[in-house]
Amino acid sequence: MESIGIVAPQTMHFAEPLRLQSGSVIGNYQLVVETYGELNAARSNAVLVCHALNASHHVAGVYADDPRSTGWWDNMVGPGKPLDTNRFFVIGVNNLGSCFGSTGPMSADPSTGKPYGASFPVVTVEDWVHAQARVADAFGIERFAAVMGGSLGGMQALAWSLMYPERVAHCIDIASTPKLSAQNIAFNEVARSAILSDPDFHGGDYYAHGVKPKRGLRVARMIGHITYLSDDDMAEKFGRALRRADGALDAYNFSFDVEFEVESYLRYQGDKFADYFDANTYLLITRALDYFDPAKAFDGNLTAALAHTQAKYLIASFSTDWRFAPARSREIVKALLDNKRTVSYAEIDAPHGHDAFLLDDARYHNLIRAYYERIANEVGA
């Protein structure tokens, strides 16, 4: 299947202030957006793809000045791909608080002319959805054919179906959860603590010091990567292999330098992440993850929380995902069925853990392709 090819982002400016769930107000903000495919005359073939923690608006294609800049879900979105851009108009939005061009901690605070830094207000999944709704309004899209996402993106898709039930025909929620477990909140807290305790953090105002809390970001990313992979996948990829060709005991360095392949992998991922991601953004997004809990306002009753939804749903999970285990997806399915909603559920047998939602797995992609075929028939795409 061909790639969507060269793409370019666009920046959308919004003058109307956005009141956040915290009570803070963001005024005169911008969101970076990419679109793929063509919006039909009826504006009925639009699909919103919501991104996860470290991703962005750049869902598919490449940038002209960097042929290596492949979109984070390029295997899913494009001509002839499961989400076929020959049939659908796909929108990717970089969320508020991110570090890829939308208004966030790195942006200039109009009141000071300096980066917001630690003063940027805490944002939630619900805040992102309200901001995304303004993007839809700007395109003249009254109703999405589908809102889709994996992991944190799946939480946004679910929130869309709750907050704007009349604007979502289908909700595709992959490798996600209705709320974080205590264990998941704990992982996020350890990652945040690594950043907050980095001497280069400077209370979140490190921009003025010309430094970046890279040590903390590295550790945060390493923690994340451990949770994204399954034990079996890590065993197959790395096992106990040493970086030295000779795996015998006498090949040990007897030091604390990198010796095992898994150590090398984690440090590589940590270094790469620390080079391109912003620490304040990491704090904001992980806290948004922690706060997401639509059932909280209903005394923990997810069935009651989903009572006013109108969409049809595809919920998908992966057998070896222990970060957001299949049981968490089944909680959503049960609550939807209790409300007599139309819901399809698939638990895909895949060895790759949580990261499976990003990978090119034939059974997974066939599932998504078949579901979008159904949507295409409904909207005449």
UniProtKB/Swiss-Prot annotation:
Q: What is its EC number?
A: 2.3.1.46
| Keywords, sorted A to Z | Acyltransferase, Amino-acid biosynthesis, Cytoplasm, Methionine biosynthesis, Transferase
Q: Where in the cell is it found?
A: Cytoplasm
Q: Where is the active site?
A: 151 (nucleophile), 321, 354
Q: Which residues form the AB hydrolase-1 domain?
A: 45-360
- Which residues carry the site feature described as Important for acyl-CoA specificity? 323
Which SUPFAM superfamilies does the entry mention? alpha/beta-Hydrolases (SSF53474)
Which residues bind substrate per the record? 221, 355
Quick one: a GO cellular component term?
Answer: cytoplasm
Which pathway?
Amino-acid biosynthesis; L-methionine biosynthesis via de novo pathway; O-succinyl-L-homoserine from L-homoserine: step 1/1
Q: Which InterPro entries match?
A: AB_hydrolase_1, AB_hydrolase_fold, HAT_MetX-like
Keyword Cytoplasm in the entry? The reply is: yes
State the reactions this protein catalyses. Answer: L-homoserine + succinyl-CoA = O-succinyl-L-homoserine + CoA
Q: Which domain of life is it from?
A: Bacteria
Q: Name one GO molecular function term.
A: homoserine O-acetyltransferase activity
Q: Report whether Glycosyltransferase shows up as a keyword of the record.
A: no
Pfam families from the xrefs? Abhydrolase_1
Q: Which GO terms describe its biological process?
A: homoserine metabolic process; methionine biosynthetic process
Family classification: Belongs to the AB hydrolase superfamily. MetX family.
Function summary: Transfers a succinyl group from succinyl-CoA to L-homoserine, forming succinyl-L-homoserine.
Q: Which NCBIfam families match?
A: homoserO_Ac_trn (TIGR01392), PRK00175.1 (NF001209)
The record describes its quaternary structure and partners as: Homodimer.
Q: Which PANTHER family match?
A: HOMOSERINE O-ACETYLTRANSFERASE (PTHR32268:SF11)
What is the protein named? Homoserine O-succinyltransferase
Organism this protein belongs to: Burkholderia lata (strain ATCC 17760 / DSM 23089 / LMG 22485 / NCIMB 9086 / R18194 / 383)
Q: Which gene encodes it?
A: metXS
